[in-house]
Amino acid sequence: MATGAVPASFTALKSRDHGLGFAKSMDFVRVSDLQRVKFGRKKVSVITNSNPGSEIAELQPASQGSPLLVPRQKYCESIHKTVRRKTRTVMVGNVAIGSEHPIKIQTMTTTDTKDVAATVEQVMRIADTGADIVRITVQGKREADACYEIKNSLVQQNYNIPLVADIHFAPSVAMRVAECFDKIRVNPGNFADRRAQFETLEYTEDDYQKELEHIEQIFSPLVEKCKKYGRAMRIGTNHGSLSDRIMSYYGDSPRGMVESAFEFARICRKLDYHNFVFSMKASNPVVMVQAYRLLVAEMYVQGWDYPLHLGVTEAGEGEDGRMKSAIGIGTLLQDGLGDTIRVSLTEPPEEEIDPCRRLANLGTRAAKLQQGVAPFEEKHRHYFDFQRRTGQLPMQKEVLFQLFWDLYGELFCYFIQRLLN
């Protein structure tokens, strides 16, 4: 039986058995082969590290037994009041994103990108409604070719709103559209990798390093092109589209989302490219908030100051969609995090602008007034320990009703009869 105990957060796990993953940051994973008659399984146990290094951000319960996780390290300027996090400025066309500028509002078109006329018309409606940035999905080369026509048509009609290309699975398409659009959104989970298929569950140290080199080889030309043309970029991790490599090491977790984005960010920094923002989107607001906070905690550790794009994926429609977005985006804005936001609704994109603006105004006002809470003594509930509460019952006094009935029986019956009548 082969066993090994290794830090689960290391980029390359050194163990004789590499079937590791699904552990929290800086916990240790022990893997054992269990010999079965018909099939083999691996027993995985997590050994908590009681003294994790301060150089690695990690999540911990907000209080003893609490299901809410927050970073152990600093993840915002203040946990008592809203103070906006200081970031560098990233230029998206003629629009500046960063802590020195107002929170920018953006949305995404819903038309077929190949339908140039319909897309141009929708972008103009969005711009007239008050959006600062518009994102357009670009699936293939025909859509990329249409992007040139879309950009030219908008310029001819005096619309200079920055356009963002949403790219998945197609590095060559990103290379082409970077020549005309102002910003490229890449998803680290599927730009160079495929979305997790779980075809490969075990990665050796060499396998992991080879995939990182493969990512750098594919991603670097786009970074160089964005530098050449002065384009911005969003490294946008999606909770639902992590790669096999990330899933096998970190699982479907906020830590995996952060590590996926950092792999691409390190390549950008290596090539001296800094005109990018981060996003950590999930359809679950709790996961989304935990991922963003962990990302910021990690950036504080690294000394990075890149802006944040906030959003909840597939929030829905009507009140439900607005409430989900308000919970996720609003929580982070109260933390002082977020420099551009999108409220994702299954409605016409123009309908996203008003709730987006309301949230941006609330976040701006909270930061301006540095809204907070008065100091108070925290008393945490113990979720797993049972203890009977003590207290004093109300005073009880014995009354002799028989005497009342004997003395005033006739009068009592008279009043009862009157009530019944």
Give short role names for the model-derived ranges.
Residues 1-40:
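N-terminal chloroplast transit peptides
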Residues 83-85, 99-118, 137-139, 161-170, ...:
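Active-site mouth loops of central-metabolism enzymes
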Residues 103-109, 132-136, 161-167, 184-186, ...:
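Hydrophobic faces of well-ordered beta-strands that scaffold small-molecule active sites
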Residues 110-115, 128-154, 188-210, 276-285:
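Glycine-rich, proline-tolerant flexible connector loops at the mouths of alpha/beta enzymes
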Residues 130-132, 180-197, 335-350:
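Glycine-rich phosphate-binding active-site loops on the catalytic face of alpha/beta enzymes
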Residues 141-165, 213-230, 263, 295-304:
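Alpha-helix-loop-beta-strand connector modules within alpha/beta enzyme cores
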Residues 160-230, 234:
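Hydrophobic or amphipathic alpha-helical targeting/insertion segments
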Residues 202-219, 223, 245-405:
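Catalytic alpha/beta core domains of metabolic enzymes, predominantly
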